[in-house]
Amino acid sequence: MCRRIFKEQTSENGEIPFYKIGTFGGEADAFISRELFEEYKAKYQYPKKGDILISASGSIGRTVVFTGKNEYFQDSNIVWLNHDKHLDNSFLKCFYSIVKWAGIEGSTIKRLYNDNILNTAITLPSVEEQQKIGAYFENLDNLITLHQRKPIVVNSSSTMNALPNQHLYFQVLE
């Protein structure tokens, strides 16, 4: 997990996006300085490109694939699993989407602790099979996303002869 960032260390503008549990998977609304980012990245654990980040509080189990961009995440609320080459991240992302975390059902304040993650049994097929399963579900997710998008119709208010003065209007079809 990343090192704790305090509110006074953030700003509304800046170089490095800082994701809290409420902005995780969306747009950052806080930023930290490059200097603080570089210091913490060098001193403390930091995810590697392709790691699956998981929310450990709030909307427990929400996942995001870490892109490798310079960004920082809220301490123990956003975690990832360091693992060896016997586990494929695309398969892990699928697993995270269906797992029933032991010990969090019924509690008033939902929280996913390291023990919940580390003590969860997972049956692993071969890495090659994990990659195929992960790719299959990633493609399925992409198809679902494409079908959920609304088409955009583009109408031109002028002819091609008046291209420099052309205006485009966008209409979302319901």
Language model features: what each stretch is:
Residues 1-174:
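Feature detects amphipathic, helix-rich regulatory segments
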